[in-house]
């Protein structure tokens, strides 16, 4: 078994992924609410 030479890489990638998922969720919610209000 090999030790990961850069242990800080995985949390950064995880935070970036969660950030993109949060932005996508806000984007989808904005579209749903705008379509709800404009109908």
UniProtKB/Swiss-Prot annotation:
Topology versus the membrane: Single-pass membrane protein
Assigned GO CC terms: photosystem II reaction center; plasma membrane-derived thylakoid membrane
Pfam family, one: PsbL
GO biological-process terms attached to the record: photosynthesis
InterPro entries the record matches: PSII_PsbL, PSII_PsbL_sf
Cell compartments where the protein resides: Cellular thylakoid membrane
Transmembrane stretches, start-end: 18-38
Major location (coarse): membrane
Similarity section: Belongs to the PsbL family.
Subunit structure as annotated in this protein's UniProt entry: PSII is composed of 1 copy each of membrane proteins PsbA, PsbB, PsbC, PsbD, PsbE, PsbF, PsbH, PsbI, PsbJ, PsbK, PsbL, PsbM, PsbT, PsbX, PsbY, Psb30/Ycf12, peripheral proteins PsbO, CyanoQ (PsbQ), PsbU, PsbV and a large number of cofactors. It forms dimeric complexes.
NCBIfam families: PRK00753.1 (NF001972)
Function: One of the components of the core complex of photosystem II (PSII). PSII is a light-driven water:plastoquinone oxidoreductase that uses light energy to abstract electrons from H(2)O, generating O(2) and a proton gradient subsequently used for ATP formation. It consists of a core antenna complex that captures photons, and an electron transfer chain that converts photonic excitation into a charge separation. This subunit is found at the monomer-monomer interface and is required for correct PSII assembly and/or dimerization.
Protein name, as recorded: Photosystem II reaction center protein L
């Amino acid at each position: 078994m090999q030790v990961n030479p850069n242990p800080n890489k995985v949390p950064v990638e995880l935070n970036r992924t969660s950030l993109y998922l949060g932005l996508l969720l806000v984007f989808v919610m904005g579209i749903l609410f705008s379509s709800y209000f404009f109908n």
